[in-house]
Structures are given as C-alpha cells and as structure tokens.
Amino acid sequence: MNGHLCAQGVLPNIRLVNVPSHYKSDTLYNSNDTSIAGRYMLDEMTIIDETNPAYRLMDSVYANRKKHDPDNIGPMRFKTYDKAAAVLAGDEAVKEYITNEIGYKTNLFVMESISEAVVVPPNGKKETVVASKISGVKQPQFNIFLSELSNVSIYQEDIKYIGDTYLSPVNHYVRGNNKKYYFNIEDTIINAPADTTFVLSFRPLLKQDFNGFKGVIKVNSVDWAVESVIADFVKSGASLYDLKINHKFNKHPSGQWLPSEWLTVIGMANGLIAVDTASLTTPADSLQADSAYLFGYPQINVERYFYDYEYDSTLRKRDVGHIKLDMDENAYYKSDTYWNNNRYVPLTEEDENAYKLVDSISKEAHLDKLANLSSVILNGYIPIWIFNMPIEFMAMLDNYEKLRLGIGLETNSRLSKHISLGGFWGWGFRDAKAKWGIYAKALIDKRTDFRAMLGYSKNICKTSSYESIYSRANLFDPETYRYYLGSNWNTVKTEFVDVSIRPFSDFMFRAGFYVSNKKPTYNYQYVVSNSDNILVTRNEFNFTTLNLGVIFAYKEKFVMTSTGLKSRGTKFPILTVDYQRGMKGVLHGEYVYDKIEASLFGRYNVGEKGRFTFEIKGGYIDSDIPYPNLFVPLAGYSPITYFTPRAFGTMRVGEFVSDLYAYIFLQYDFGNIFNRKGLFRPSPSLVFNYGYGNLINNSLEKHIGIDARTMEKGFYEAGFLVNDLFGVSYLSFGLGVMCRFGYYSFPKVLDNLSLKFTVTM
C-alpha cells in the first residue's frame, strides 16, 4: 500500500503489467531502485479482513471455557497463598525521599493468608482461611477483602469487582453485529508440532461503552485454554482507581489448565502524595523545570499463588455448602515457625520492614481499635467500651413524626460474643411523644446463623405491618425510602420473641410470637357486635399472633464473619413466604385469623447494560379483622418526590385496602445506551406497576373514618425515568414521571402524574 516493491536475487528486466490502477505500467531494469510514476496519490490505509482469524481462535476458547473455568474443575482440593502489599507508586524520587525519611525501604502495609479450597462442580468453590497475618491489626473483615480482591477470573461471565461489573473478553467478545471486543493476532509461538501459542491483543470496540478490559491474552491451540492474560480494566465512567490483572495458568498432568499465579494491581491515582522538590537531595529525572512538587500515590499489589492440586473423588456437594469463605478460629494465632514453613513465597525486605513499622505504629496509635471502629461503623454501630451505639436510632424520618432524634445502646462482643442486651429511646418532634424499647439478642450458632431475640417496645408502626425493635434499613440503601412512604400509622406496644435459623444452604426459617396493642393515630373506628349483639365501635385492638416465615434463595452464597454469616447474594429469584396466625383468648388476643403473604423478587442483567427487576406479591386474610392488620398498598404519591422501586408512585396514602391482593412491579433499565462519557450519561428506564385488591371477608361499612376503597378493577401505572442526567463527584441525579391510567385514573390529567427524581452512585 505504500508503493514499494522488492525483488531479491539476480533478475532479468521485468515488465510490470498488472499493476494497481493508480500506477502506470512500466519496465523495471535490473539496476538501482526505480520509481514507478503514479497516476494519482492515495493516503495509506489498513484494511482488516471481515473474517478476522483472531475471532475464530476466540470461538474455540469460548467453546471450551467451561472446561477450563477454575470454578468448574474437579472435584479437587488445592491451597492458595495470598499477599497484599500497599506500596508507593509514581515518581521514583518520591519513593527515594520516603525511604530516606524512614531510614529503610518499606511497604506501607502488608497482609497474608493461607487457604484450603475445595471445588465440586457444579456447586462451586469453598475456601477456608487457615492462617492470617496482617500488619498492625487483627480484623477478619480484611481477609474477606483480600479474598474478594484476589478471586477474579477471566473465565467469569460477569466479573464483579469493587462494586462494579465488567464484561469478560472470553465470554462477551460476541461474534456478528454485536461484537464487544476487537482481537488481533500479534504473535505465534510454536511450542511443538501441533502445539502453538497464539498471542492476541484485545480491547473494547470503538464507540462501545461498557466496563471491560484491554490487554494481551495467550491461547493454547491444543486445549484452547488461556495460558495467560495481562489486562487493564476499562471503566466507562469516572473511577477512583486503576486496575490491572496478570493471570498465569499451567497445564496439570491430568490435561487440565489450572491457575498458577495471579496478580491484581489497584492504583489509587486520586490519592496523591506531594513532596516539595526543595526537600530532595538528589535531582529527579522526571522533574519538570516549572514543577515545584513531585507526586506519588498508593498502590495495592495483590498476589495469589495456587499449589498442591489434588483430585479427590470423595468430595461431595456438602463439602462446599453455602459458605463461600470460611475462617478457622485459630487463623490469627499461627506462629512465626508455621509461617516460615508454609509461606509459598518468601517475604521481600520491604514486606518484613512493613510488619515492623506498622506493628510499632499500631501499638502507639491503637490501629487495631481504629480498624475495629471502622468495621463496626460499616455494620451500623459506633463502639463505646463494652457497648455499641446503633446508628439507626440516632435520627429517623417518617411522615408521622417527621423527625425523631434518639439514642440506642447494646452490649458488644467485649462483654459476650453470644449474648447482647440493649435498648433505645427517641423523641418524635411532630407528635411530641417518646418511643422506647428494651431487648436481648443471642447468636446461638454461627454456622447455621441460629439467632434469637426477645423484647418489649412502645413505638409506632404502619398499617398492615407487624414490627419488632428494628424497623429501618441502611440509610445508604436506595430502597430505604420505602419505609418513609406515606401510610396510616399506629402506636403499638409489643412484646415479642423471634428466632431464625438457616439449616440448609438455600433456606432460612423464622418464627415469632407477638403480643401487641395497636391504636390508630388517625380517626378510625371499627364496628363490632358486643355480647348483647349490639353494634359498637372500637379504636384500640389487641393482637396475639404466631408468625412463621421461610426464605428460599437458590444457590445463595455467604462468607463467615465474627458476627455470623454475611450474604453474597444469588443470581436466582428469591421467594419469601410469611404466615401469621391470630389467636383469640391467648394473652388478651381478640381476633382469630390466618394471614399469608408471598413474594418473588428477581434482578437480572440483560446484555452488557440493561437490567430487569421484578417483584410479584400476593396475600390473603380469611377473616374479618380491624384495619391496622389488613393489607394496604405501599403508596408514594406526591406531585414531586423521590422515586421508590416496587411501590405505587401515583397512589395516594390509604387510598385502597384489601384482604386479598396481587401486585406486579416491573422495571427495565437500559443503561447508558447513548455511549456518553463523563458525568452526563443519560440512562433511560421504564417502569410498570399493577395492583389488584378486594375485600372478600371484610366490609368497608365496618371501617369508619378511613377514606379507602378496593381495587378489584385493577390499578395501572407506568413511568419513564432518565437516570444520570447530571452529576456531582460520584453521585448522579435523574428525573422522570409516573402516570396513572385505567379504571382508577382521575379526570384531571395532572392528578394522574407524579414527577420523580433519582439518585445513583
């Protein structure tokens, strides 16, 4: 294409006949370089064949991906050694300066762990940390963090890492018109006859916007397995860090390609460390003439080594179970002799110095206590000596009290690892009344998450709900606002006992016994017949109930922590069933009834951007009971308000009531379909909600003072949202509108509309 022709050896004169159309025909004489006159000039260009051979290679890798997936090998046992070291990256002069100030080379932080793992296809993998060592602190949550950082495989379909999801080039390169990655063969290495290693570069295709990778992958032609991959994470939006991986695989005598050495590098380029160049004793090569500072930044290097592979046909599903990451109780107490004999690779000089430096600082600055403080705060508590102060009791918002300020205290593990005693007190500003409660909690068995709780409270609760001490979700959860949506509130005095247990991997069972007195805060009267068969009204009600429930979450995985099991979720829908039996004549109970509710909730990623969320709910009450325990839909109408998933955004508070209901909530998020970069990345979303409700065993005439009706004709609403319209730092804001239609729509169009705003991170 650049116009140069070369003929080697002794050749006679050559007559060029079939030359490209943009050159003239001519005779070349066997002499020095000769130029061929051009008719016209063309710019140089590169033409790529539509049948790119690199894609044919990736077809074979894709077809064999399950065979070589590290989570799909076995049944097998193996061990891993993990080491994470925080180092200072950036200008060498900065690192030199830090070394001179301290007096020796050192890393900023180091932690290690040794784990024993089992893999039983198709049930997955379980790791047990048998040894752990962390400079300065002894906190189990760091081992969970280390495992999450080092447990990323290029074979995973959707790679979840530090809160984001990335599309693997092995699973998502996709042929045809929907290709996501471009591949190119860079080199071919002949290992032996019929054994070749292909070196391919890859990157996201231009004009594609998704979280992915770019780098180099080596593919073996015999087994079509990945030999190694070196890649940078490519994030579509703003990022707080830079990520790189370097994974190597070795061929086992069995013929299986197994992980050998994995390296993950996390560069926190936004955490700059500046050094005044005037303080440097030696000039820096990278120093610019007009620069007064040099910069470095923290970087975490996470190494994982796999060894002692052993196939074990005796392994069964129960050997994996539902605990993905377990912790040996003696993991933190291994001797130096143990580490010297079992550490897979020796520590560097910088690693050893980091232990000495950080341990000495920890004794002076009490880093272990600070680490414990951060852990507890992330779990919703502030530790004070032998007490924890639950954050949720400090400030609460709802549409009845408007604002409640208070305090809560409960004993922590420093007093007892299994039993906790606590209480709370709060003051509601709108109703000018105090709420309080006392309780005791017990963690009976961590492995089955067997827990018990009993207590007494004087609080408020929404109509149709029964609630114990805890009633608020994490303030940082976008669905927390569901709790604050409008409802008819009741004052409630409750004595209760709750137990829950997870005896099997996919099931959690719970049971509770409640004795409660409810009094509506609104003007409500319930019509009943007295002993003389005369109709009277009441506005205070006593309930004694037995509550049973089960949650089925297929293949839900957990990690073991010091406080019990923590869920890592499941990709399958979650089924929840709750049953309540009202008992008359038992501890002042006045009503006998059966109440059952069930819900099916699921969330699925569609393609590389879309996400579909659904919930189907239903419930039934077989008897005539007061309004506070009937079913009331979650209504969230206001002319302008926050969008709340799985709630009726155009329904008024207390507008409908039922003892038989069925709800459907659907939402589809398209993602950043416009492939915009930066903070303006509009992401449209469609919402559809349906509700049916009726009073089968009750009559509206018996409920005086409520302006409610049934919705047996079907309630319909739909909405259109645009998320990420504009952003501030790492928060994005959006707008949308919900519209009510169908039989229960209002004559005025504006009454059917509700403007919504959204907030995402």
Regions found by a protein language model. Give the residues of each.
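Boundary at the C-terminal end of the N-terminal hydrophobic targeting segment
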Residues: L5-G9
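Structured extracytoplasmic
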Residues: V17, Y23, A37-G212, T281-M396, ...
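Short, hydrophobic/aromatic-rich segments at coil-to-beta transitions
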Residues: P75, P193-S201, A225-I230, Q256-E261, ...
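Hydrophobic lipid-interacting interfaces of membrane-associated proteins
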Residues: K83-A85, L205-K207, V234-S236, V265-G271, ...
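Exposed, low-structure sequence patches enriched in small/polar residues
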Residues: T165-P169, Y307, Y311-M761
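Extended lipid/amphipathic-ligand handling interfaces
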Residues: G215-I217, S221, K244-G255
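Strand-loop-strand
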Residues: V229-S236, Y241-K251, P259-G271, L421, ...
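Transmembrane beta-barrel wall of Gram-negative outer-membrane proteins
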Residues: L243, K251-E261, I266, I300-D312, ...
